[in-house]
Amino acid sequence: MARYLGADCKLCRREKMKLFLKGSKCESPKCPIEERPYPPGEHGRTRAKESEYLLQLREKQKCARIYGVLEKQFRRYYEEASRKTGRTGENLLRILESRLDNVVYRAGFAASRDQARQLVRHGHFLVNGRRVDIPSYRVSENDVIEVAEKSRELTPFVIARAVAGERTVPPWLEVIPNRLRILVHSLPSRQVIDTPVQEQLIVEFYSK
């Protein structure tokens, strides 16, 4: 599956905010946006006032970058969200949150969504007892996700056990650190999704 291969820190500077794409580096003084809080490029410091369309485009791109999803798949998610009952923007965020790589990240088993994607691809997770190596796999209510027995002593999971409790886990998930297990109690409502996006701008972008 295609994925973005450029510099993650440039994406944060382009959006003028931390997207937390680099794990612990984003929390440190070494984060480039701390030293250069303006978009990359020769004219990054003097960016012109953005049009309504550009604001909508940037919000769509920001959301896709946060979750590590490229345009073709992101649009498919939007189209699926628009067919569901309820608010399209909230449906879209719920779909993105239900991706297996995001759940692994939210549970604290990976430092970033990118690392979570790699761990899933390498076959380190079971969902309801069956190995799943597709990062975009969508979890459902009452699913049980756990680290495969053969993978439990790998460094990311040793760290996950050691720092359990230091990271806030969203209320729709439950983590059992000593068993490296994640319980999906429900899919999230908008109120508990802390992704810093204005989803209505994304809806307006695709509605044109």
From Swiss-Prot:
Any one GO MF annotation of this record: structural constituent of ribosome
All residue ranges annotated as the S4 RNA-binding domain in the record: 98-163
GO biological-process terms attached to the record: ribosomal small subunit biogenesis; translation
One Pfam family matching this protein: S4
Family: Belongs to the universal ribosomal protein uS4 family.
Role, per record: One of the primary rRNA binding proteins, it binds directly to 16S rRNA where it nucleates assembly of the body of the 30S subunit. With S5 and S12 plays an important role in translational accuracy.
Protein name: Small ribosomal subunit protein uS4
